[in-house]
Amino acid sequence: MKKPQLRLGARGIVIREDGKIAIFNKSNKNEYKLPGGGLEGEEEPEKAFKREVLEETGCEVEIIECLGTTEEYKSLNNFKQISYVFVGKVLKDTKQLNVTEKEKDEGAKLLWETPEKALEIITKCYNELVASKYESVYAIKFVVLRDRKILEKWMEFNR
């Protein structure tokens, strides 16, 4: 068996002072997820998390906790992703998202919700997933399930 393509990522929970957390919606892709993305080159996971959060939420954050890692293996694509998972507290909100053209085309927008509402939205997304012109249900389910599990575990240990 061929060795899977490996991608390293950094993602997690971003909390405002009012207790609401960020969820990133790609409406044309039928996806709700926590902020985060791939590491660039030799980038450290903490720097990648802060960069991705700034791009996807417009917020500068302080990392207050490292929750660990997640590992996904997509056998149909022979693809493995390891994500470093953090909790970040908003220090400053620039109110300016810096998303890619692809993310704009996918309908990228930011929502701030209570953790309970965020979990409800992500769970509903997972349960009602449909394919889009961007991704198959197979690919999106990994993202949404991963982030649902991160949020569930964080809520379980922080409530």
Model-assigned labels for residue ranges:
Residues K26:
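Short loop/turn segments immediately following the C-termini of beta-strands
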